[in-house]
From Swiss-Prot:
GO aspect biological process, one term: translation
Gene3D superfamilies: 2.40.50.1000
Gene, per the UniProt record: rps17
Key words of the record: Ribonucleoprotein, Ribosomal protein, RNA-binding, rRNA-binding
Family affiliation: Belongs to the universal ribosomal protein uS17 family.
The protein's name in its UniProt record: Small ribosomal subunit protein uS17
């Protein structure tokens, strides 16, 4: 229904920015990360770790990026959960992603 292969949440919501029960189209990247903050209303902060090669030292360094994502009412997410987020139209100044699946706790 959403255009990607994820199970639909069991609970219903009336959020217009929900890709399952609202009318929010998804396009672009689909990423995975760990939730590090859920303090903002209907927003979670997802952290992704990756390695970057430093040519001068011929070594890798660990880097991380934090992405703000919209959390629909029908998806229950807590800090420490591994989630799948999908790119959508800009929902605010910093939110361009929405949570589509909870993989579980890390």
């Amino acid at each position: 229904m959403v255009g990607i292969d994820v199970p639909e949440p069991k609970s219903k919501c009336s959020d217009p920015n929900c890709p399952f029960h609202g009318d929010l189209p998804l396009r672009g990247q689909i990423l995975e990360g760990t939730v590090v903050s859920d303090k903002a209303e209907r927003t979670v902060t997802v952290e992704r770790s990756f390695y970057k090669f430093i040519r001068k030292y011929e070594r890798y360094e660990k880097r991380k990026s934090k992405i703000k994502a919209h959390k629909p009412d029908c998806i229950d997410v807590r800090v420490g959960d591994t989630v799948k987020i999908a790119e959508c139209r800009p929902l605010s100044k910093t939110k361009n992603f929405v949570v589509v699946e909870v993989k579980g706790e890390e």
